[in-house]
Amino acid sequence: MVRLPLQCVLWGCLLTAVHPEPPTACREKQYLINSQCCSLCQPGQKLVSDCTEFTETECLPCGESEFLDTWNRETHCHQHKYCDPNLGLRVQQKGTSETDTICTCEEGWHCTSEACESCVLHRSCSPGFGVKQIATGVSDTICEPCPVGFFSNVSSAFEKCHPWTSCETKDLVVQQAGTNKTDVVCGPQDRLRALVVIPIIFGILFAILLVLVFIKKVAKKPTNKAPHPKQEPQEINFPDDLPGSNTAAPVQETLHGCQPVTQEDGKESRISVQERQ
């Protein structure tokens, strides 16, 4: 009765030795297949055949432009990424059998996504705005308006707002105030004084010229002439005893406007009102 349990234990050990239990888990960098724990292929290699009771896992290196970046049991390697220049892409880091190619954007462009499958141009900050944050390969330009005391007169994706020039530090005076798009204009104090005095001098000279022209015009204006003195008519007497003298009525000769005028005797000598004046 005592020997039976002992025999059962012996038979159980024998059967276990002949038919071992399949493992339920494998170690790191191994995989379970056909009740066997086979080694994974290292990065840069692909699986050709699984291991057996008598052979190890068979792996081969990836081909040109291919890669595998982890311990694996893949039968095919992955193709390297293509950086399409038509999309603004260029190779930042060439791929190997263990790493993929890394693409980035051309200068002045940035990726539209984390995968960087295409690019767009950086934004430029217009005049009056400066660059707060310069664009990177994966982010766009960030602009900000120039505050008081600063300006930007260009459209740029790199220029920040510049401070106004300090005229005082150069012993100059401000001739024109700055804006968010223009710098302060400085100049010497003598020039500023001249800019004030010269227009005043020109104004005075212009006023004098106007007065002289007015006086000249007044001097040329004709004055009223004094009236000619009224001349009394002169009587011309002819002797009666001259031969061939005419016995007709005597004729008087007067002056009309300094010209002799014949007046018959016996008629009154009258001068028109207009002639008297």
UniProtKB/Swiss-Prot annotation:
Tissue expression: B-cells and in primary carcinomas.
Range of residues in the leader sequence: 1-20
Record's GO cellular component terms: CD40 receptor complex; cell surface; external side of plasma membrane; extracellular exosome; intracellular membrane-bounded organelle; neuronal cell body; plasma membrane; varicosity
Listed GO biological process terms: B cell activation; B cell mediated immunity; B cell proliferation; CD40 signaling pathway; cell surface receptor signaling pathway via JAK-STAT; cellular response to erythropoietin; cellular response to interleukin-1; cellular response to lipopolysaccharide
Keywords of the record: Cell membrane, Disease variant, Disulfide bond, Glycoprotein, Immunity, Membrane, Receptor, Repeat, Secreted, Signal, Transmembrane, Transmembrane helix
Effect of residue 39 to T: In bladder carcinoma cell line Hu549
TNFR-Cys repeats: 25-60, 61-103, 104-144, 145-187
Cytoplasmic side: 216-277
Disease: Immunodeficiency with hyper-IgM 3: A rare immunodeficiency syndrome characterized by normal or elevated serum IgM levels with absence of IgG, IgA, and IgE. It results in a profound susceptibility to bacterial infections.
Protein name, per record: Tumor necrosis factor receptor superfamily member 5
Record lineage: Eukaryota, Metazoa, Chordata, Craniata, Vertebrata
